[in-house]
Curated annotation (Swiss-Prot):
Name by which UniProt lists this protein: Phospho-N-acetylmuramoyl-pentapeptide-transferase
GO cellular component, one term: plasma membrane
Gene Ontology terms for molecular function: metal ion binding; phospho-N-acetylmuramoyl-pentapeptide-transferase activity; phosphotransferase activity, for other substituted phosphate groups; UDP-N-acetylmuramoyl-L-alanyl-D-glutamyl-meso-2,6-diaminopimelyl-D-alanyl-D-alanine:undecaprenyl-phosphate transferase activity
Residues that span the membrane, as ranges: 5-25, 50-70, 77-97, 117-137, 147-167, 176-196, 203-223, 227-247, 250-270, 302-322
Keywords: Cell cycle, Cell division, Cell membrane, Cell shape, Cell wall biogenesis/degradation, Magnesium, Membrane, Metal-binding, Peptidoglycan synthesis, Transferase, Transmembrane, Transmembrane helix
């Protein structure tokens, strides 16, 4: 029965995304919600200018509808599911506002860094308030062991850092056709397996709903992309995967399973530090995926390589938690 629920969930998420896309993409095009491309980016990306963005709306709709329908068939909506849906929708709305300012108000940078940070913090604080209300654990566990450490009030700081940092890390990865869609499907798939292994079936259902939604989106987002998810999708996915890691007490393992997102973020941090301290850049461009483009790799080769890296890291994460 449970296996059937998981199968139907991923199929439903996939089909909703696939069926919504042919409706939403022309609608976004008519509204002229096209992506503007930074001039300092790779020259090969200039031809993507005008590609409909904010496609993350179809991902979020697919996740919400699929999760609610399948959860009600399996059990009642749990506090964990409420938190997952809240964070996904909250960060998705923040990303939508950022995208709207970029494409409609023609402010290419969207929300200022300060405005976006304030929004991310507010959502994280509300999340933790609800998390604390339901008396969820404030300990952090060492993957593959029974060792755990209660952080007490300091767990709030960790949650804040993870949600803000994690959503931004996933957002940075969304720079090539299909890159984030593929790596997200792999990472959420890994967490679905681990949540299932812990008998957290509601979290597993949510996770596979995301897998189905992003795979359906990937049909139209693979190179050459017909639509981009925008910050609407990337911030929502970032918030969602961090929330899953918190609810499954796999905060540390997120660094491995989400290793591609971590590496992308580190490449930006190292680039900034190097340039400010030495005046030299480590990479031709950051995040890292742009560096490989500029050394001559095709966009598709970069994407597939990062997918492969994400898959290896996901398998490693599962191995550490389940079999080590």
């Amino acid at each position: 029965m449970l296996e059937q629920v998981i199968l139907f969930t991923i199929l439903m998420g996939f089909l909703i995304s696939v069926l919504l896309s042919p409706i939403l993409i022309p609608f976004l095009r008519r509204l002229k919600f096209g992506q503007s491309i930074r001039e300092e980016g790779p020259k090969s990306h200039q031809k993507k200018s005008g590609t409909p963005t904010m496609g993350g709306v179809m991902i979020i709709l697919s996740i919400i509808v699929t999760t609610i329908v399948m959860t009600q068939k399996f059990s009642e909506i749990s506090p964990e599911m409420v938190l997952l849906l809240f964070v996904t929708l909250g960060y998705g709305l923040l990303g939508f506002l950022d995208d709207y300012i970029k494409v409609v108000m023609k402010r290419n940078l969207g929300l200022t860094s300060k405005q976006k940070l304030i929004g991310q913090i507010i959502i994280a604080v509300v999340f933790y308030a609800v998390y604390h209300y339901y008396n969820f654990a404030t300990d952090i566990r060492i993957p593959g062991t029974d060792l755990s450490f209660d952080l007490g009030w300091a767990y709030f700081i960790l949650v804040l850092f993870m949600l803000v940092g994690g959503s931004n890390a996933v957002n940075l990865t969304d720079g090539l056709d299909g890159l984030l869609s593929g790596t997200a499907a792999i990472a959420f798939g890994a967490f679905a397996i681990l949540a299932w292994n812990q008998s957290q079936y509601d979290v597993a259902i949510f996770s596979v709903a995301v897998v189905g939604a992003v795979l359906g989106f990937l049909v139209f987002n693979a190179h050459p992309a017909k639509v981009f998810m925008g910050d609407t999708g990337s911030l929502a996915l970032g918030g969602a995967i961090v929330t899953i890691a918190i609810l499954t007490k796999l905060e540390i393992l997120l660094v491995i399973i989400g290793g591609v997102f971590v590496i992308e973020t580190l490449s930006v941090i190292l680039q900034v530090i190097s340039f400010k301290t030495t005046g030299k850049r480590i990479f031709k461009m950051s995040p890292l995926h742009h560096h490989y483009e500029l050394v001559g790799w095709s966009e598709w080769r970069v994407v597939v390589t990062f997918w492969a890296a994400g898959l290896l890291l996901a398998v490693l994460g599962i191995y550490i938690e389940v079999w080590l």
